């Protein structure tokens, strides 16, 4: 039986909207939307999704701007713009690198540490929501483990090894 043009178009539309890239994007978009809404409700209305490139790659130590940009996979110019915004809001501070006086290091301020702490609590809340929807925490953890395994096998790891494996740092 031959398919009609409408059926073929419907098949193509389905395939375009239900591929791995789209599914991962939708999941990520929903996860991040829930996080930003919760942070806004907790008193962080100026924090934007782009700022996660800083917080997800900074940690609690001091990091040079160049390394931070590399970890976040953005240009130094883009990282500098985000850092200026976060510095103006009081979440990060720039210090002179003790090893190289020409370089600047970025560190979290006390309000920045509070924001990170609140962010971690929000992530736990969002994970709880997903666990409920997916059939329990064990199902969510299996999904996370599968994604981590895929990232490792595809050699997409870009974090410092000590962040990936605490035994190494």
Task: Give the positions of each predicted feature.
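C-terminal regulatory/oligomerization modules of transcriptional regulators
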Residues: 1-13, 137-169
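Charged, amphipathic alpha-helical coiled-coil/dimerization segments
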Residues: 4-6, 84-148
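Alpha-helical linker/hinge and terminal dimerization helices associated
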Residues: 20, 24-27, 31-38, 72, ...
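N-terminal leader segment of winged-helix/HTH proteins
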Residues: 1-46
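N-terminal helix-turn-helix DNA-binding core of bacterial DNA-binding proteins
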Residues: 33-75, 164
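Residues within helix-turn-helix
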Residues: 65-66, 77, 84, 104
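Residue-level recognition of specific faces of alpha-helices
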Residues: 23, 54-57, 78, 82-85, ...
């Amino acid at each position: 039986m031959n398919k009609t043009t409408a059926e073929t178009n419907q098949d193509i539309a389905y395939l375009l909207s239900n591929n791995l890239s789209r599914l991962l994007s939708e999941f990520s978009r929903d996860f991040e939307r829930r996080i930003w809404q919760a942070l806004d409700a907790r008193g962080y209305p100026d924090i934007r999704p782009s700022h996660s490139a800083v917080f997800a790659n900074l940690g609690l130590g001091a990091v040079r701007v160049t390394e931070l940009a590399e970890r976040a996979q953005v240009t130094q110019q883009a990282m500098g713009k985000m850092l200026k915004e976060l510095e103006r809001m009081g979440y990060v501070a720039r210090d002179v690198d003790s090893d190289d006086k020409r370089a600047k290091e970025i560190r979290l301020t006390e309000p920045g540490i509070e924001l990170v702490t609140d962010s971690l609590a929000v992530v736990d809340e969002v994970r709880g929501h997903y666990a409920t929807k997916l059939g329990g925490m064990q199902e969510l953890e299996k999904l996370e483990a599968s994604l981590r395994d895929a990232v490792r096998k595809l050699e997409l790891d870009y974090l410092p090894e000590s962040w990936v494996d605490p035994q190494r740092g």
